[in-house]
Every structure is written in C-alpha cells, then in structure tokens.
Amino acid sequence: MRALARSLDAAPRPVDVFFRDDDAGWEDARLLELIARFAEHGLPLDLAVIPAELNEGLAARLRDSHAGLHQHGYAHTNHQHEGRKCEFGPARDKAAQREDIARGRDRLREVLGDRLDPFFTPPWNRCTRDTAENLVDLGFRLLSREHKAEPFGLLPELPVHLDLARLTPEELDERFAGHVADGGPVGVMFHHGVMEPDDMARASELLALLATHASVRARKMRELCP
C-alpha cells in the first residue's frame, strides 16, 4: 500500500472514505468475519442486504451490530435474457420493478426496524431510469452504484470506486491512491461471499492503514447522504 500511503501523506485535507459490503444474506460466516475485522479496526461498514435471503437469525445479529444497513435489490436474481446480469434492468417493466423494490423494503423494515437506512444498491450495480423513478416515488434517499455509471439526476447518488474482489493488491494500491488525489469521497466495495482467508488478510492490511492515517475520515453512508 505504498502508493496509497504516499497519496494520503500528500493530501491537503482529510479524505472521506466509506465501505460497502454487498450480498448480506449469503455466506453468513464470512459476513460476520468481515464485520469483526471492521470492528477490530474501529471502522464503519455499510451492508447491502438482500431482502429475500435475510433470515431471522442473521437479522438479529445485524440489528445488534454497528453496521449501516440498506436494501440490495430483492432476491439478487438475474432477469436479463442476454447481456450483463441485472435484477432491475430493461427486461422488466417499471411496475414489476416497483413491486419488488417495495416488497423488499417492507421485508427489511419488518425485521430490521429503524436500523434500516432508506438507501438502495442494485445487484450487480446496475439498474434503469425506471428503477430510480421508483426509488424516488417510494421514498428512498440514496442510490449507490459504481462510479462509472452515469447519474440519473433524480436522487442523490453515492458510488463506489474500488472493488476489492476484482483488483490485485497492486491495482488496488494505485487506483486507491488516484482517487485520494482526486479528493474523495472514495467508496470501497467488498463481497464477503467470495473472500478467502488471503482476501480477509489483505482487507485487514488495508483497514489498518486507513484506520490509523490522519488524512482518512472514515464515514458511514448516511453521513455522506445530502
């Protein structure tokens, strides 16, 4: 993490950083391990929770955690017949999308109560303008996708910039450094379900640096929501 450390050392002001882990509801043991790693370093974590996959036992654990909690689609199911995977893509009409979003929101409200933030992360970080319009109509306050996605301009968006699962240590170092130089905020995305022990160790190395550097201001997503 030498490039990142140098970039943080050179930052003229603190850089906001947030952490979003997707697919809560799958691979509970790995999820709880990642939550524990963040707790060890005293860093905030936001979880994108799959409504149809959340069981009562995990819901209780999440309510008792310090993690931010928000909605991750409905069932994380691909509805596209061709092209890239998408749960809320052009293959579905606006009414069908709205039904799933509302059903998922109601399910999470039932089991998570006031711990649920009115934010939405679409599975695979993809959705349509119809999705965004539905989110506005249903009272959501924030949409989170990847930073390369063109904003819809309908509600605030807080994108992630770095996908820990897809980057080599060298790529993560260089790209994180570049986003720090741009001034932030910087969103770091995790997928606990694919994290092996080596990945957890690499995550801990990154968290240790970010937790102790004076130029890092670690935030929950709700703190960055307008």
Residue ranges and their predicted role:
Residues 2-12, 142-143, 192-226:
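C-terminal domain-boundary segment and adjacent tail
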Residues 80-91:
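Surface-exposed, active-site-proximal loop segments in enzymatic domains
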Residues 1-68, 117, 188:
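Active-site beta->alpha N-cap acidic-glycine motif
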Residues 158-185, 189-194, 198:
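A conserved mid-domain beta-alpha-beta active-site/ligand-binding segment of alpha/beta enzyme cores
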Residues 23-29, 48-59, 121-130, 164-170, ...:
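Acidic-and-aromatic substrate-binding clefts and catalytic sites of carbohydrate-active enzymes
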Residues 5, 31, 35, 59-62, ...:
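Generic structural signal for well-ordered alpha-helices
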Residues 24, 73-77:
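Short glycine-enriched loops at secondary-structure junctions
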Residues 92-166, 195-202:
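Catalytic domains of cell-wall/extracellular-matrix polysaccharide-remodeling enzymes
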